[in-house]
């Protein structure tokens, strides 16, 4: 069993029940899924760029990404409907906990001038969004093989009803929020 999942079952549930006075343990918010999205705007001109992004995303998450396609045509971007423009991965279960553990313990501390993640990036429904400027913070990415530094969006979807509950859940997992 993953370290974070074990921590959730033992400490986190107990702490949240005490803090929010839940009548049942089943009311405690959980992390439902983590969606990692990498938008590749250069893919319009060069399809090889998208292949590199897909490969890197697969290394980072350990799961094959889904190639996202344009929903509408936009003439100013020379973009047609159905053109591949990015990649995304939805992580659930064991892989989700492994990714979150790696993100909190290894990757985020490797960010340059890191003071913590934003406290205000919650969406009002208990989901947290985090933007990463470069894929090099992940240990699986080899610096010499990177052709272009790319960022990504990481969305942590929880079953929490409020942002306060979600913030407390992530804080208990060890998410380093700014003071």
Curated annotation (Swiss-Prot):
GO cellular component: ribonucleoprotein complex; ribosome
Keywords per UniProt: Ribonucleoprotein, Ribosomal protein, RNA-binding, rRNA-binding, tRNA-binding
Gene Ontology MF annotations: rRNA binding; structural constituent of ribosome; tRNA binding
Transmembrane segments: none
Biological process, per Gene Ontology: translation
Keyword Nucleus: no
SUPFAM superfamilies per UniProt: RL5-like
Entries under InterPro entries matching the protein: Ribosomal_uL5 (IPR002132), Ribosomal_uL5_bac-type (IPR020930), Ribosomal_uL5_C (IPR031309), Ribosomal_uL5_CS (IPR020929), Ribosomal_uL5_dom_sf (IPR022803), Ribosomal_uL5_N (IPR031310)
PANTHER family: 60S RIBOSOMAL PROTEIN L11-RELATED
Similarity-based family: Belongs to the universal ribosomal protein uL5 family.
Subunit architecture: Part of the 50S ribosomal subunit; part of the 5S rRNA/L5/L18/L25 subcomplex. Contacts the 5S rRNA and the P site tRNA. Forms a bridge to the 30S subunit in the 70S ribosome.
General function of this protein: This is one of the proteins that bind and probably mediate the attachment of the 5S RNA into the large ribosomal subunit, where it forms part of the central protuberance. In the 70S ribosome it contacts protein S13 of the 30S subunit (bridge B1b), connecting the 2 subunits; this bridge is implicated in subunit movement. Contacts the P site tRNA; the 5S rRNA and some of its associated proteins might help stabilize positioning of ribosome-bound tRNAs.
Protein name in the entry: Large ribosomal subunit protein uL5
Protein encoded by which gene: rplE
């Amino acid at each position: 069993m993953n370290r974070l999942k074990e921590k959730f079952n033992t400490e986190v549930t107990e702490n949240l029940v005490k803090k929010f006075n839940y009548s049942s343990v089943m009311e405690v918010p959980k992390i439902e899924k983590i969606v990692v999205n990498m938008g590749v705007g250069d893919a319009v001109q060069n399809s090889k760029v998208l292949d590199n992004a897909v490969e890197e995303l697969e290394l980072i998450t350990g799961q094959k990404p889904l190639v996202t396609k344009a929903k509408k045509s936009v003439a100013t971007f020379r973009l047609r409907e159905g053109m591949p423009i990015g990649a995304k991965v939805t992580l659930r279960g064991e892989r989700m906990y492994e990714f979150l553990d790696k993100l909190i313990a290894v990757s985020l501390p490797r960010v340059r001038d890191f003071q913590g993640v934003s406290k205000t990036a919650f969406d009002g429904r208990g989901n947290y969004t985090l933007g990463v400027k470069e894929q090099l913070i992940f240990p699986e990415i080899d610096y010499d093989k990177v052709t272009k530094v790319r960022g990504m969006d990481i969305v942590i979807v929880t079953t929490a009803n409020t942002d306060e509950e979600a913030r407390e859940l992530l804080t208990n997992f060890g998410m380093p929020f700014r003071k």
